[in-house]
Regions:
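Pocket-lining segment of extracytoplasmic ligand-binding domains
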Residues: 166, 171-174, 178, 183-274
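Small-molecule pocket liners
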Residues: 44, 118-124, 215-216, 230-234, ...
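Cleavable N-terminal signal peptides
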Residues: 15-17, 27
């Protein structure tokens, strides 16, 4: 049976409260946008846009005064609920949750990605020396993820399980997963005295965990997907995009501006991340992550189709994506994504 935690109950309550803090209108005048972000370096482009007011600046260049409202949630399931309820217009989610919301809203709200944000590898880490591969995980083990099965990490774990045990057993490890925000999971892992002995993490938390010599990496998104891949995207609905073309264009331009800033000045980007996430990490530590050879921040997606094809093959989504353009808005006809 999956254990429960006071922090989980508190988080669930806060998620529900957050969904009602903002007005639930689905349509409004140009110049207003409600954005839901998540914690972590994966959504650095939105954090840079917020910190530097890049959306407002892009709007001003087009003669539009934009009021941006921000909220932060944890996990793709909570964020998808915020989008579907109208509590958010635009949000950060992983490729797994993107496939889910794209599949389920086709022909209705038609949620798709505006742009990629980052290709930052995510690691499955453990503090148990016994566990060296997926096949070593058993009944006594518990894996912390932000949303059981449906998060980006949950979907990657399903893909790894299918690779190890066959497609019919893709959900074999789901029953060992526990809902827990990354920060709490990191604390549990570092304590060494929690029921949690694995964490499918993200940046910067996985790097903090690996600073402890008792913690090691079991696998990663890079290994599961066979190379670097976009893990975080920015999404909205076709309806919101059509109803707010100028605001949408400002958001899209701001993401490109943010990507250029990150590419040009990693030190400034690290400082922005620390400021926006309220992180206690040192600027040098964060900058080292941003300079990792396997990490990149670009608005064109990389190696995303493979996960979508897998989710269709095992029956998680009904519609098979044939191209990355199926679940991304076609704003740049010349973009060479994958």
């Amino acid at each position: 049976m999956t254990p429960t935690y006071p922090l989980q109950r508190l988080f669930a309550s806060l998620t529900l409260i957050a969904a009602f803090v903002w007005p639930l209108q689905r349509a409004h005048a140009e110049g207003q946008v409600k954005i839901v972000d998540q914690y972590g370096i994966g959504s650095l482009l939105l954090k840079v846009a917020k910190d530097q007011k890049l959306i407002e600046k892009a709007g001003a260049r087009a003669g539009l005064d934009i009021d941006v409202q921000w909220n932060t949630l944890s996990g793709g399931a909570a964020v998808n609920e915020a989008l579907l309820s109208g509590a958010g217009d635009i949000a950060t989610i992983g490729i797994g949750p993107l496939m889910t919301i794209w599949d389920r809203t086709r022909g209705r709200q038609d949620f798709r990605a505006i742009a990629a944000q980052s290709a930052v590898p995510v690691y499955l880490v453990t503090n148990d020396p016994r566990i060296r591969s997926i096949k070593d995980i058993g009944e006594k083990d518990r894996i912390a993820v932000v949303s059981v099965a449906v998060s980006q990490q949950g979907r990657l774990l399903q893909m790894a399980s299918a690779q190890a045990y066959g497609d019919a057993n893709y959900a074999r490890l789901d029953r060992f997963e526990v809902n827990m925000p990354h920060a709490d999971a990191t604390t549990a892992m570092l304590s060494g005295n929690s029921v949690i002995n694995l964490h499918f993490s993200n940046a910067p938390y996985q790097y903090q965990e690996l600073e402890d010599p008792k913690i090691h990496k079991v696998t990663s998104s890079t290994e599961i997907l066979g190379g670097p891949s976009t893990g975080s995207v920015v999404v909205t609905s076709e309806k919101w995009r059509k109803d707010n073309p100028k605001t949408y264009a400002a958001v899209r331009a701001a993401l490109d501006d943010a990507a250029r800033l990150v590419e040009k000045d990693k030190a400034q980007a690290a400082a922005i991340y620390i400021r926006q996430d309220g992180s206690k990490l040192s600027p040098a530590f964060v900058e080292r992550i941003l300079n990792d050879k396997d990490t990149s921040f670009a608005t064109t997606p990389q190696n995303t189709l493979q996960l979508g094809a897998f989710l269709h093959k095992v029956g998680v989504i009904r519609h098979e994506p044939k191209s990355w353009r199926d679940y991304f808005f076609a704003d740049d006809k010349n973009a060479q994504g994958s």
